[in-house]
């Protein structure tokens, strides 16, 4: 029903890509039709139709964060709230206001359990450099509050792209939309369990909280049922010509951020490297698969 309606509206002309359908197809929804598109989307979800929609970024877009937390257990709701409060408080200092927080039910990824969390700031418009800088500010805040975890691996960087490589990054799956993923047991080759498709449907992100940015900032629990106003909060596309400018923090938490002076004396000792790697895997939380590639003194 939803895809047929999109075709009737001639949204499938691919002239200015706005949405990708993970079950096949792309859409070009003009901004003056976005409200109608959102209304039809909610109508389809409420009717029980399974949708697979990933919204693509406009040149300037409403800021968002993608958390991919993998560990031997899933995050609790309390832990999710704690992490999101730290992130939202940091973004608030740079002009962010209310934030929509959506959560995907935990799923098994290899030997780990993945907890996915999406955060959306409506009308908090950024360009690519500012989005990347905001992520770095978030990494600093999380590392100070919860230093035992490698947040650089958890706060997805790929969604923002890379300025130097001129890559734009990915889009953002809409709330209540499912995901078509490779069926890992058969490696996507197709088997009896996945009915020969090689793919499985992964469940949707559901809105659970709103961060209220007032003087006493707090998280408010919300109804996860399909809701037009909540869907509009999650939209990343915008026509807004103005965007905020955020400079990177003075201390950036990312891999490979050492100076030339710090890396001029490399230690070539495989036995020592192995001992340090073993110590890290055994004693540092969340680092059970870490690999030591180089040592410097």
Question: Where are the regions a protein language model picked out?
Answer:
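Histidine-centered divalent-metal-coordination microenvironment in nucleic-acid enzymes
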Residues: 60-65, 98-134, 168-177
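Ordered, helix-dominated protein-protein interaction surfaces in large eukaryotic regulatory proteins
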Residues: 67, 89, 93, 121-123, ...
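Well-ordered, non-membrane alpha-helical segments in soluble/globular domains
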Residues: 77-90, 131-148, 272, 276
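Long, contiguous regulatory modules within eukaryotic nuclear regulatory proteins
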Residues: 87-89, 136, 150-153, 162, ...
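DNA replication initiation on ssDNA origins
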Residues: 1-84, 94, 157-161, 165-192, ...
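Charged, compositionally biased non-catalytic regions
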Residues: 1-3, 122-138, 245-284
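Short beta-strand elements
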Residues: 95-105, 153, 159
